[in-house]
From Swiss-Prot:
Keywords: Host-virus interaction, Inhibition of host innate immune response by virus, RNA-binding, Suppressor of RNA silencing, Viral immunoevasion. This is RNA silencing suppressor. It comes from the Viruses. Belongs to the carlaviruses nucleic acid-binding protein family. One of its GO terms (molecular function) is RNA binding. Pfam families: Viral_NABP. InterPro entries: Viral_NABP (IPR008891). The keyword Transcription regulation does not apply.
Length: 90
């Protein structure tokens, strides 16, 4: 991910190439990119994972760090909008 030039395209080819490079499945899974994936929607568990990534994630030893552009791309591609609510409403 040293070369961010592949993030700029909006064509179908660019989206497929981006998904291949980032290992993002059509179902929104972060860790796999299966062509025959049978999942169709993003679960609340995956939304929680994305929220955790967005709020801050520490890369452990031997782990690939998660970049903000990647999180933004996943949110945009799968129409995920995390609404911040305050718990102080009375």
């Amino acid at each position: 991910m040293d070369d961010p030039s592949f993030l700029t395209g909006r064509s179908t080819f660019a989206k497929r190439r981006r998904a291949r490079r980032m290992n993002v499945c059509k179902c929104g899974a972060i860790m796999h990119n299966n062509k025959d994936c049978k999942s169709s929607s993003i679960s609340s568990h995956k939304l929680d994972r994305l929220r955790f990534v967005k709020e801050g994630r520490v890369a452990l030893t031997g782990e690939t760090p998660v970049y903000r552009t990647w999180v933004k791309w996943v949110e945009t591609e799968y129409h995920i909008y995390i609404v911040e609510t305050s718990d102080d409403e009375d």
